[in-house]
Amino acid sequence: MDERRLKGKRRVQLGKYAAVRGRKEGRLPAVMYDHRGVSVPLELAQQDFDRLFRALTRSTVLSLELDGGEVFCVFVKDYQHNMVSDRVEHVDFYAVEESVPLRMRIRLQLCGSPEGVRYGARLEKGLSYIEVESLPRNLPDRVVLDISGLGAGDVRRVRDVPLPASVVVLSDPDAVIVALSSSASEAGSPAGARTG
């Protein structure tokens, strides 16, 4: 099975009792909503969803095959999580049209330890998400920004975010994502000498 593909079946029996029985048999109850507001009650294998769940973000696109036929492009819209069993007990999917661009907030993930921090500079965080527009299949789950080379006084803005050409950034390009404040100790450091 594709790593982002789920197989579901329409639920014939609805209600709390049917959902509880289904969970005992390893089936996860769910509902798929489309852009017209139409809802389809369905169920899928709990283990298949659990396998994907930890890596999902709000912008992760999944392929949902329904009744062995039509495949829908979906996002996880909402879910119910059981704190005792640490399992998802219900999922709401939102189906979108693959040919229509979507606006979506994408999480920013910073990686690396800024060089300037070793010399006393302070890391200041700004945006944690950016807004983009793209066809559903081109949307990234998250955006990784390497900040390991930052020195005191350096700033990374939205315009510095690496994104494919198929993704249009809607956020202010000058908005700050991360900055390193200057410090007295960095002024005489090698990192301080490189930054202007």
UniProtKB/Swiss-Prot annotation:
Gene Ontology biological-process entries: translation
Top-level taxon of the source organism: Bacteria
Gene Ontology MF annotations: 5S rRNA binding; structural constituent of ribosome
A Pfam family hit: Ribosomal_L25p
Keywords annotated in UniProt: Ribonucleoprotein, Ribosomal protein, RNA-binding, rRNA-binding
GO cellular component, one term: cytosolic large ribosomal subunit
Segments traversing the membrane: none
Alphabetized PANTHER family for the sequence: RIBOSOMAL PROTEIN L25/GLN-TRNA SYNTHETASE, ANTI-CODON-BINDING DOMAIN-CONTAINING PROTEIN, RIBOSOMAL PROTEIN L25_GLN-TRNA SYNTHETASE, ANTI-CODON-BINDING DOMAIN-CONTAINING PROTEIN
Family: Belongs to the bacterial ribosomal protein bL25 family. CTC subfamily.
Function of the molecule: This is one of the proteins that binds to the 5S RNA in the ribosome where it forms part of the central protuberance.
Assembly and oligomerization: Part of the 50S ribosomal subunit; part of the 5S rRNA/L5/L18/L25 subcomplex. Contacts the 5S rRNA. Binds to the 5S rRNA independently of L5 and L18.
Protein's name according to its UniProt entry: Large ribosomal subunit protein bL25
Record organism: Treponema pallidum (strain Nichols)
Underlying gene: rplY
